[in-house]
Amino acid sequence: MSETNGGNAARENSEVKQTAVENPIDKLDGTPKRPREKDQDEQAEETSDKSEAPNKNDEEKKEEGKKDQEPSHKKIKVDDGKTVESGIVEDDKKEDKFVFGAASKFGTGFGVAKKDTKDGDATTSTESLPASDSKTKKPFAFGSGLSFGSGFNILKNKTENNSESEKKATDVDKDKVHSGSEQLANASEDTKDKPKPLKLQKQEVKSGEESEECIYQVNAKLYQLSNIKEGWKERGVGIIKINKSKDDVEKTRIVMRSRGILKVILNIQLVKGFTVQKGFTGSLQSEKFIRLLAVDDNGDPAQYAIKTGKKETTDELYNIIVKSVPK
């Protein structure tokens, strides 16, 4: 009990002290204000009054604007017998704006089609199109309303003409193929009718040396001198032979044929008094030459020079010719 009494007494003392402290502050609030502070308070009140006035004016203007925005919808009768609000009609008139090129021919090529949206349904209006176009609508074609738009039709006509020409060409080709096949068939029949070529038989070609015996032969080159003004001329290259007759031992001749075509370029019969000489004064290789005096094909006197590849072969040829000359 004593403790509780002591606690209550302490609380009462603290409350008394607080009131003692608060009272002087309240007294300070009641002190008179300075003249400068009064002027500031008056100015603040005036500004607050002014701000409230324009706010009221703004609210009034907003309300007037809303009234102006509200459409004055009046019902108007249309030709179809339906009633439409006048505000909607005015809005539709406002939507019809000027389109660049709508009155020209070029503008019609793009198809002037307007879309009227009413109650969520989309309908196309044909106000600017003539009556004939509204009845029969043609598919849109770029440049159809222009003066040069007919160029596309010309191309179309050309394609049709081309298709016709192609058909004609195919028909002509078929005719050609048919005629060609007929020609081939006729040609095959002609070949069957033609007689077959005869088979050729091999025949023996006689050179005139069959009844002779070759004593000596060697490769050589032949030169001929018929006219001193013309000089020596080369007759050809081939094999020179010394042939002796099988029937008559005393008959011997010198035969030379050109290589390849086997043409006779030298044919001399060895007789009494036939002369053979060694060497050739006009050549640096005179030891490889031998010379013969005889008569040419025309019966005129001529001189022949025979050249071999080696000196030894030239000596052998010379010795055999000298021995074969009849005495």
UniProtKB/Swiss-Prot annotation:
InterPro entries, per the entry: PH-like_dom_sf (IPR011993), Ran_bind_dom (IPR000156), RanBP1-like (IPR045255)
Alphabetized SUPFAM superfamilies for the sequence: PH domain-like (SSF50729)
Stretches for region Disordered: 1-96, 109-205
Key words of the record: GTPase activation, Nucleus, Phosphoprotein, Protein transport, Transport
Positions carrying Phosphoserine: S179
PANTHER family, alphabetized: RAN BINDING PROTEIN, RAN-BINDING PROTEIN 3B-RELATED
Physiological role: Important for the export of protein containing nuclear export signal (NES) out of the nucleus. Stimulates the GTPase activity of GSP1.
Protein name (Swiss-Prot/TrEMBL): Ran-specific GTPase-activating protein 2
Organism: Saccharomyces cerevisiae (strain ATCC 204508 / S288c)
